[in-house]
Each structure stands twice: as C-alpha cells, then as structure tokens.
C-alpha cells in the first residue's frame, strides 16, 4: 500500500485527496452494509418474533442498505463527474442558452484530473455492490482495502479488478520465485514491443491523416484508420501487458483485458474480447440490473400483451436487452471522454448490437431460405472481416478531433484519392 501511494503521489500530491475520499466512502459503506446484515441476522433469531415483524425488519434493513449504496454511488460518481465532465456540461449549457437567443455565458474552469480516477471509482463501487449482494464479506481493515483501491500497476489503465479475486492474493504469502519474475519481465518486454515498435510507429501515420481530415481522401483515409487501429491496440494492449507483467512479478495475477479481439465474429463478441474487464463490469452492474428491473419487466409484459404477431412477442423479450445495450454503450462512450464524439462512438456500437438483437429472427429465416451454413469456414471468415470493418468505422469517432472531423473523414473515403504520398 505504501508503494502504491508513493507511486500515486508522484503524479501530484494535490489529487491524493480524491482517492482517499473514494477509499473512505466505499470502505465505510462496506462496513455499514455488513453490520446491517449481521444485526438483521441476530434480530431474526430472537424468540417470539411474528412473521410480520420479521418481514418488517427485512424491509427496514433492505431500505437502509439501498440508501447506503445509493449514497456511495452519488459520492464516488459525483466526484468523477465533476472533475472529468464539468466543462463538457458547461459548454452544452452555453450552447442551449445561445440556441434560445440568450446572451449569458457560464465560464469554464480547470480542475486537476486525478490519476486513474475512472478505474479506481469503478473498482471501488464494484466492491460496495458485491458486499450489498452478499458476494463478498466487507473488509474490516482500511489499510488492506486501500491497497485494493490504489494497487499501483493497474491504477492508470486497468484492468478493473474485483475484490473477491484480488484481496486473497494481496493477503497471501508470496515467496521469491525466479521463474515468476522472468515470466513477468517477458510479458513486460512484449508490452514494450507493442507500445514502442507497433503503436508509436503506427501513430505517425494515423496522426498525419486524422490531424488533417480535409487533406486526405480515398485509400489514405482507410490507411489512416488502419494505422490508428494498430496504434490503439498496441498502446492499450501493450500497456496492459506491462501492467500484468509488473504485477505478476509481485505474485499478483490480474484479469485478462484482451483476447484476440480482431478475430471476433460480431460486435458483441468484440466487446467480450476488448477491454474485457470494463465489459464484465458493465454486464454485472448495469446490464443485468437494468434489463431485469421492474420497469423493463413491465415493458416486456406490455409488448407481450399487446402484440399479436410472433415478431411482436419476440420484441417483448428483446426490447429490454436492446435498451440495456444502448444504456451500456452510452456509458462506455462517456467513459472514454467528455465529448460528443465519444458518445456517438459508444452509441454506434450500442445501435449495432441492438439492431442485431432485433433482427435475429429475420436473419435466422434468411439462413433457412438461402441454406447458408453458419459454421462454414467461408462464412466465419466473412463475419470476422465484417466485424473488423464495423469496428474500424467506430475508430473515426474515437480518434477524430471533433465529431465534424469524424464525419468528414468518413465522407472522404468514397472520394477519389488526392494525395500521391502519405
């Protein structure tokens, strides 16, 4: 923990208050949740309690626990929203004021952005929710918990850890093992190769094209996005390799964050292979709670009741999933940055996944009519190529300076090549 905080202080001592606040809030929340559950168990074991009394005690405890979780969410994500997205919000408010003919303008201001705040915020909130669900026991030692939140190899770019997998490793005895250290160094070296040989070299080409969206057309725009694809993967996956290699040298095994994403057969599979820990976080803490919520259940029943066609009944099941996908990828877009281009980037992926879910019965019918073998090698190859193309289209929104530049680059793909060099 001392080493992790020393590393964190190197990025600036002024921002350490944010990680301390997150640590204290989520640690305290875990203790309160655990204590409430223990007190409930003791109360329920008391003699002479009627069934109604037990039910009332359970409801009271459940309400209190929900309030603790909501308060933790508001505090942790509230801080994240303020420090990371305040100027984006102000700029949009100013745009609305101007659109309605107003002359007033709210001034933007600069706040220090704490190192790794998105990662440790998500990681610490997962702990609170897991304690609430009874998946893990609350940690009763704030120093041990602080290590989980601040573990230095992963704090800058992940992977997003889970308490039930990391805490036992932190508490376990680790002996010197030369083979483990060598393997960790090898993985770090592989990460350095991806970063400095692949990503940095590809970045020269992608920067040239994306920094001058009006100058390059045709094949050069495609070359630019392919270079960015290599740059992004080399930079991100290489960084993760270095993180995991360094952590492995300490005897701590982190969750995989990449699994050959460019061999995916669909956008959904791509996101199960790319930034895996973010995807599983969204699945466990957003997708399932939202898609299985009372509101989505009522929506599904409404469609089922008022739909007379087979497709309508299918939509009763598919719609909650589609809406959950859209919500997840809206959050993923916001996660990537405070700009509309990132929101469009996220929604692009969400719309494709939702559309695929809605059209699944239609696709199945087409396969039967055309007698296409979905397991055939040629078809599987086509799926990989199709997914790769769709993914690379999304990179235009991710890497362009503005949303306008992204659309400009996409338009220029269909235009004749005007540059004789790159």
PLM segments and residue spans:
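Positively charged, low-complexity/disordered segments
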Residues: 415-417, 421-422
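Membrane-embedded transmembrane alpha-helical bundles that form the catalytic cores
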Residues: 1-414
């Amino acid at each position: 923990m001392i080493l992790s905080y020393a590393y964190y202080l190197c990025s600036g001592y002024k921002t350490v208050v944010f990680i301390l606040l997150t640590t204290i809030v989520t640690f305290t929340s875990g203790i309160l949740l655990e204590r409430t559950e223990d007190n409930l168990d003791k109360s329920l074991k008391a003699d002479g309690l009627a069934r109604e009394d037990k039910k009332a005690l359970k409801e009271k405890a459940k309400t209190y626990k929900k309030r603790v979780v909501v308060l933790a969410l508001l505090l942790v994500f509230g801080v994240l929203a303020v420090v990371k997205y305040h100027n984006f919000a102000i700029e949009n408010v100013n745009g609305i004021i101007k659109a309605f003919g107003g002359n007033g303008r709210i001034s933007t201001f600069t706040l220090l952005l704490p190192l790794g705040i998105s990662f440790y915020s998500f990681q610490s909130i997962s702990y609170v929710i897991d304690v609430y669900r009874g998946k893990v026991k609350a940690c009763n030692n704030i120093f041990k918990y602080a290590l989980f939140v601040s573990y230095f190899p992963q704090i800058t770019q992940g992977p997003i850890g889970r308490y039930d997998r990391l805490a036992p490793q932190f508490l376990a005895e680790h002996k010197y093992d030369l083979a483990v250290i060598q393997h960790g160094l090898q993985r770090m070296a592989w990460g350095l190769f991806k970063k400095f040989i692949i990503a940095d070299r590809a970045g020269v080409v992608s920067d040239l094209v994306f920094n001058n969206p009006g100058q390059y057309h045709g094949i050069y725009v495609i070359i630019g996005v392919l270079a960015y694809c290599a740059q992004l993967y080399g930079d991100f996956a290489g960084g993760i390799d270095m993180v995991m290699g360094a952590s492995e040298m300490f005897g701590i095994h982190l969750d995989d964050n990449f699994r050959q994403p460019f061999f995916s057969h669909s956008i959904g599979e791509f996101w199960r292979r790319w930034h895996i820990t973010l995807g599983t976080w969204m699945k466990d803490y957003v997708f399932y709670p939202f898609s299985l919520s009372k509101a989505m259940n009522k929506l599904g029943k409404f469609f089922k009741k008022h739909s007379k066609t087979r497709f309508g009944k299918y939509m009763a099941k598919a719609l909650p999933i589609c809406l959950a996908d859209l919500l997840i990828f809206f959050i993923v877009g916001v996660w990537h940055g405070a700009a509309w281009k990132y929101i469009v980037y996220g929604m692009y992926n969400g719309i494709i996944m939702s559309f695929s879910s809605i059209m699944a019965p239609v696709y199945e019918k087409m396969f039967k009519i055309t007698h296409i073998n979905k397991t055939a090698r040629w078809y599987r190859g086509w799926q990989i190529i199709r997914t790769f193309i769709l993914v690379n289209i999304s990179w235009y929104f991710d890497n362009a300076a503005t949303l306008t530049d992204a659309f400009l680059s996409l338009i220029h793909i269909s235009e004749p090549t005007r540059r004789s060099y790159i």
